[in-house]
Amino acid sequence: MPRESYRERALVIRTYDLGEADRIIVFLTQHRGLVRGVAKGVRRARSRFGSRLQPFVELDVQFYVGRELESVTAADTVGFYGSGIIDNITCYTAASAVLEAAERLSLAHDEHDDRLYPLVVDTLKQLQHAPEPKLRLDTFLLQAMTVAGWAPSLYYCAQCQAPGPHHAFHPRTGGAVCGTCRPPKAADVNPEVLHAMWLLQHDRWAEAITLITAQEQGASARDSSESVTHEVPCATAIHRLTKAHWQWHTERKLASLMVLDQT
């Protein structure tokens, strides 16, 4: 009896060598979430499609259903997003963090959400020429957490739903918190930072960049008249809060994100 087969759009998340010539590949697929497959002979020089099975390449993959691993018998390139990423360490690390986060979200949910795959693809496309790769990653994490049901509250108090603007953020509570509900360990935050995060969360990139630029220029002007710098740059604050919210809800740090913060 012939084995069941199917075709899927897919991105390579990670790979493992198997034996002398084979490779196990973890894919993020468009409609089936994470799929683990084995590609026979792809490490040989004569492999027809082995060179395509790498991160930042979108593929149309032919899978045959297996007991534990699918068999990968064909893979056609749909899009290559490595240009502008693989030659820039910051962009490369941010893009790697996107793939790592997508895998983590897929593992955390039994049911696949079709919104995740296009979000990953769009982010990789943007990272090819992104002047602010870390901010692009933060945007992805905010939007991906929305898909997962972990979106931080950024205007209303996460505890009592009182409207903002608010001046504190607490991941465990769910995001922004008012003065009445503020827990002892909540982080102080400029309301403009929360506003910029809200814009990024809702895919309003241009407005967010305008706000971030204006806020940082204003902070720089204020700090230049004082002997001590008091304000954290807006983009830095966004990154810290986004990372804290992600780590609280996933209970795991992203290895690529830790590397990115050191670059």
Identify the meaning behind each predicted range:
Residues 1-263:
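Non-catalytic alpha-helical scaffolds and adjoining flexible linkers that form interface surfaces
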